[in-house]
Amino acid sequence: MPKHGKKYRKATDGTDLAVRFSVEDAVAKSLEASFAKFDETVDVAICLGVDPKYSDQMVRGAVTLPNGLGKTVRVAVFCKGEKQAEAREAGADIVGAEDLVEQVKGGMLDFDSAIATPDVMALVGQIGRVLGPRGLMPNAKTGTVTFDVAKAVSEVKAGRVEFKVDKAGVLHAPLGKVSFGPQKIAENLKALLDTVQRLKPSSAKGTYMKTMSVSTTMGPGFKVDPNDIRRFLEG
C-alpha cells in the first residue's frame, strides 16, 4: 500500500475517500484538498463501459473548454504554401513542412500540440514513431488534421483538450488549474462530459459512464456518485 506524506494525510484528514460525492462536491473537495505550493492542475478520470480492444468502442475526441486550461500552449503546424502564413497569423509557434520534419527527427520537440494539413500527412508519417508515443501525432478525429489551420490553432490556444480512452477503458483529461475555482472547473467538466456523451459508441452496452474521480496533481481523488453524473449532464 503506498505511503503518503504529511501534507497529503493532512489534506485528507477527516475525509472518507470511499464516499461518493455529487459532481460539484467532488470538484470543490478536490480544490480544498490541494496543498502544493504551485497552482496544481485539476484532472478527471472517467471509467467508461466500453471495451477499447474493439475498434468500434474506441472513444477518442477533443473539446475546447469554455474556461481554457490556464497555461500557454505551444503549437506546431505542418503545412505548405499560403497555409503557413495563415498558421502564423493565427498564433502558431512553429510552422514548416520538410524542414520541420527534419527538426523533429533531430530531436526538436519544443511544442505541446501539433496540427497538419491533409496534404502533408505522408510527410508527417515519417516522424509518427516520435510524435505518437508523446500524444502529438495529428489526427483527423481530434480535428488536428485539417486545411482550416487558423481555426485549429485558435482552438488549441484557447484550451482545446484531446482525449482517448486507455486500454483499461479509462479516460483521463485536465480541467484547468486550482486557481480557477470550483465553478469554472465544473463548467469545463460539463463541456468535457457533454462531448464524451455524444461520442458514446452505438455498440456500448450497459452503463456508459461507470465511475468518475476528480483530483489535483498532488492531491487525493474524490469519487463521484455514478447516479449524479446523469443529473449533472442534464442540468
Swiss-Prot record:
Subunit structure: Part of the 50S ribosomal subunit.
Keyword Repressor: yes
Source organism: Oleidesulfovibrio alaskensis (strain ATCC BAA-1058 / DSM 17464 / G20)
Cystine bridges: none
One GO CC annotation: cytosolic large ribosomal subunit
Role: Binds directly to 23S rRNA. The L1 stalk is quite mobile in the ribosome, and is involved in E site tRNA release. Protein L1 is also a translational repressor protein, it controls the translation of the L11 operon by binding to its mRNA.
Key words, A-Z: Repressor, Ribonucleoprotein, Ribosomal protein, RNA-binding, rRNA-binding, Translation regulation, tRNA-binding
Pfam families: Ribosomal_L1
Protein name, UniProt field: Large ribosomal subunit protein uL1
PROSITE patterns: RIBOSOMAL_L1 (PS01199)
GO molecular function: rRNA binding; structural constituent of ribosome; tRNA binding
Gene3D superfamilies assigned: 3.30.190.20, 3.40.50.790
Matching HAMAP family: Ribosomal_uL1_B (MF_01318_B)
An individual GO BP term: regulation of translation
Highest taxon of source: Bacteria
